[in-house]
């Protein structure tokens, strides 16, 4: 297994790495056997590595498939890490050329993607609506739960041509 630390080694020495971060490694897209070859090549062309963490599990994370734009359409999403920045790349209908980028941010701690459906989205809205959670639109396909730092998550949901940030776990 190839292991790379994020950023410059001096920034992530044990004394300077945030304690909640855990050990983050990055894998080549080729390490994901279920990922279609055209998407692997597209990720490599963008120089993406897929961030992982050894916290709690050795299971590979941050490559998922689901219906993120239209029910029944198989889309792929991967966390792309480059130069200390991570973002979610969504390959619509499995196409390596029809790609949306969402949630681009500095890598200050690990992130983990999962597929969520209508029930999860509505339950989290109900639990947090008194705290000002955004009311979701009609839910007719899946969303991407973007968890970070083992603290909270945001559901990325495609609606009417743009990404909405809906309430996730807190």
Regions found by a protein language model. Give the residues of each.
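Acidic, small-residue rich beta-repeat scaffolds with periodic aromatic anchors
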Residues: 1-38, 105-170
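Short, non-transmembrane alpha-helical segments in secretory-pathway proteins
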Residues: 27-57
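N-terminal post-signal-peptidase region of extra-cytosolic proteins
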Residues: 59-66, 76-78
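Acidic, divalent-cation-chelating loop motifs in proteins
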Residues: 63-71, 93
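Acidic/hydrophobic-patterned starts of short beta strands in beta-sheet-rich repeat architectures
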Residues: 70-80, 136-145
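Beta-strand C-termini and the immediately following turn/loop, strongest in propeller blades
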Residues: 79-81, 124-125
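Structural motif
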Residues: 84-90, 153-155
């Amino acid at each position: 297994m190839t292991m790379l630390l994020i950023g410059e080694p001096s920034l992530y020495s044990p004394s300077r790495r945030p304690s909640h971060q855990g050990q983050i490694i990055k894998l080549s897209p080729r390490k994901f056997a279920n990922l279609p070859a055209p998407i692997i090549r597209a990720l490599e062309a963008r120089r993406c590595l897929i961030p992982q963490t050894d916290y709690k599990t050795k299971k590979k994370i941050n490559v998922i498939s689901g219906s993120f734009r239209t029910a029944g359409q198989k889309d792929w999403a991967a966390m792309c890490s480059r130069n200390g920045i991570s973002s979610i790349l969504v390959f619509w209908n499995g196409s390596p050329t029809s790609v949306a980028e969402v949630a681009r941010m500095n890598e200050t701690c690990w992130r983990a993607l999962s597929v969520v459906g209508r029930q999860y989205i509505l339950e989290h809205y109900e639990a947090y609506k008194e705290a000002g959670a955004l009311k979701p639109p009609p839910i007719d396909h899946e969303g991407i739960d973007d968890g970070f730092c083992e603290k909270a998550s945001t559901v990325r949901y495609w609606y009417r041509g743009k990404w909405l940030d809906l309430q996730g776990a807190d």
